[in-house]
Amino acid sequence: MKKMTKSNSDASGSLFSSKLFDENRFYDCFLKDLNNAKEEVIIESPFISTKRMKLLVPIFKKLAKRKIKVYIITRRPEEHVEEYRWQSEKAIRMFEVMGIQPLLCVGNHHRKLAIIDREILWEGSLNILSQIKSREIMRRIEGEHFALEMFDFLKLEKFL
């Protein structure tokens, strides 16, 4: 099947591109986006797994070293079953040591997204910090309007 990238313009006339990824292709592109981040990375993922963190910790360390602000929005560990609770607690401690700001949510938190430099928006069904075996989909939208729309919709300015 041919991969397609859709380029368009939004209501303001600004150009944007949109591309779909499955769980097999997501991380390659997402890691490139993280490596290219210039100022800020926001990741919202309700679950955290030790196995997935093994892939992400090296890039998080590089981002911290480059003084890129990284915010992780996730569930409070107490809201997880025991298996995920300890993995979440371990990752949150690791984030804090690296200088990454974890923002803990309460009450059925289940959104999965990332905003990079407020210019790239990733959204879909894939838990960025925990996905291992499940079949998922993520859409990458490159266009400041969409990233800022999500940032404003989530009222993130109150927390960052």
Residue map of PLM features:
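Short, well-ordered alpha-helix to beta-strand connector turns
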Residues: 37-38, 110, 118
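Short solvent-exposed loop/turn micro-motifs enriched in small/polar/acidic residues
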Residues: 105-108, 132
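Short beta-strand scaffold segments in enzyme catalytic cores
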Residues: 112-115, 139
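Primarily the HKD phosphodiesterase
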Residues: 32-97
